[in-house]
Amino acid sequence: SKLTNKIFCFPGNAGTSQLATNVEVNILNFKKILRLIKFFKIDLVIVGPEEPLVYGIVDYLKKNKIKVFGPNKYASKLEGSKAFMKMICAQNNIPTAKFKVCNQSKQVKKFLNICNLPIVVKADGLASGKGVSICRTKKQVIKKTSEIFNGKFKSSKKVVLEEFLTGEEASYF
């Protein structure tokens, strides 16, 4: 925009450096980010990465009187927790694949006795795009869920098992 004379990206990357000034900072260090926003006299913050959103950066900046665009911590749970998203869909009659949220192996095994394969296994929480597996055998489901329960994706030890749907994928967020 011609109304903007300077853009900063925290932390930025090689691509953003063509358009903006990259500032190396831990995106979860909200206090340091606030100091940098004030130092550079930034008028508006647009939050992109999921992790700071899930941890509440929008709430933190608003509390500190910073103009910010992005979902608050509660709304960010739609992206940050697959289990939360599925529960919201179920409670509001939003069409979604049939699912079961599990936090222990015996729940998984019980679900395997009543469902059809393949099954989609999703780590609840942020997993850098690596927390979803399409499992075609019960053995694969047990292996993937065990990895999650054992902390593979540190963000959660909960899994969402859901029926496999064919077709185009669509995201809510």
Which positions does each model-derived feature cover?
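ATP-binding N-terminal substructure of ATP-dependent carboxylate-amine bond-forming enzymes
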Residues: S1-Y74
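Short, well-ordered alpha-helical microsegments
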Residues: L53-Y55, V108, E169-A170
